[in-house]
Design a protein with these regions (language model features):
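N-terminal, active-site-proximal structural segment of metallo-dependent hydrolase catalytic domains
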Residues: 2, 6-9, 23-94, 290
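Metal-dependent phosphoester-hydrolase catalytic domains
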Residues: 27-34, 126-127, 170-174, 188-291
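Active-site beta-strand/loop signature of hydrolases that rely on acidic residues for catalysis
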Residues: 43-50, 66-88, 145, 165-194, ...
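Short, solvent-exposed loop/turn elements at domain surfaces
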Residues: 52-58, 79-80, 155, 216, ...
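Surface-exposed cleft-lining segments at the edges of enzyme active sites
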Residues: 54-55, 148-158, 187-193
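Stable alpha-helical elements in mature extracytoplasmic
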Residues: 62-66, 87-91, 158-165, 199-203
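Structured beta-strand-rich core segments of catalytic domains in phosphoester-bond hydrolases
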Residues: 80-154
Length: 291
């Protein structure tokens, strides 16, 4: 009986959220037309797990191809996961190679997260304990950017980390806020992940319940909504077998105040990124006031 209740409750929740999501799509279409004004600028934000820091910085070929790809995409802000072997100085050197003069890292050991930008950034806080591989809080373009990478192996720890992030956002009253990174968790909107794994929805549901909006869901078709694994892993199957294993665990969320400014999103899961990392990058585009 409990299992049946859980299934029905989950279906109800999905239906409710799907209805809200459909309305958001319509609202953003209107916003897109409304915001073609001279006092606004369009920006692009990308989040990318770069797989062991390009083998602790030793894989020069991957670094070169990554740099070329970032230059082509020209994001205004780039969040990075798994900066293994990087110091902040090394991250600034990498960022400069693709046109970002500003960079920050949460720590200089383990699996750090970082942020690079075309425009000045201010580090507000670096949280370590209780936040997976860390939570980096930076101010860029008058918005609060939170970059994280949640626990990869323990769903209960992931849930606690998600709760800590929501508490941090609430206690600091971050109204114009973006949260991004490898969450190692699944969204209830991704129907290919069946209800046999309802417990894996807890992290993303926690963010949604706190009015954080999943922008890739709003703009990305079901059959393109996957960010892991790529073809770089030797153990990855091919063709349809690979597609059955692919899942979405990388996200960009925004708070209520920024939702209507978002006009597009993409998971860059094409051939250009098949062999740069084991994750595909995710990105959003939005309008903000000109500075």
């Amino acid at each position: 009986m409990k299992r049946l209740f859980n299934n029905w409750f989950s279906l109800f929740l999905l239906a409710l959220l799907f209805g809200l999501g459909s309305g958001m799509n319509a609202q953003n279409s209107t916003s897109y037309e409304r915001d073609w004004r001279t006092d606004r600028q369009k920006i692009k934000i990308i989040s990318y797990n770069i797989m062991d820091g390009f083998s602790n910085g030793s894989d020069k070929d991957r670094i070169a191809r990554f740099t070329a790809w970032v230059k082509e995409q020209s994001p205004d802000v780039l969040a990075l996961n798994e900066l293994c072997g990087f110091t902040e100085a090394r991250l600034k050197e990498l960022a400069a190679s693709y046109g970002h003069p500003y960079a920050a890292i949460v720590k200089e050991n383990g699996y750090p997260v970082g942020l690079t930008s075309k425009t000045p950034l201010q580090v507000i806080d670096r949280k370590i304990d209780g936040y997976g591989h860390g939570l980096l809080h930076c101010k860029v373009l008058n918005m609060d950017f939170l970059v994280t990478h949640l626990n990869p192996s323990d769903r209960l720890k992931r849930k606690k980390e998600a709760d800590n992030i929501i508490d941090y956002i609430s206690s600091n009253q971050l109204t114009d806020c973006l949260l991004m990174g490898d969450m190692n968790a699944h969204s209830p909107f991704d129907a290919s992940w069946t209800d046999e794994h309802l417990e894996d929805y807890a992290v993303i549901s926690t963010f949604m319940a706190a009015s954080l909006h999943d922008i890739c869901y709003m703009f990305t078709p079901d059959n393109q909504r996957y960010s892991f694994p790529t073809r770089i892993l030797a153990s990855s199957p091919k063709g349809e077998a690979l597609r059955r294993q692919q899942e979405r665990i990388d996200f960009i969320f925004v708070t209520d105040s920024l939702r209507s400014n978002c006009i597009d999103a993409q998971i860059y899961n094409g051939p250009d990124n098949d062999y740069l990392s084991d994750h595909y990058p995710v990105g959003i585009s939005m309008f903000i006031p000109k500075e």
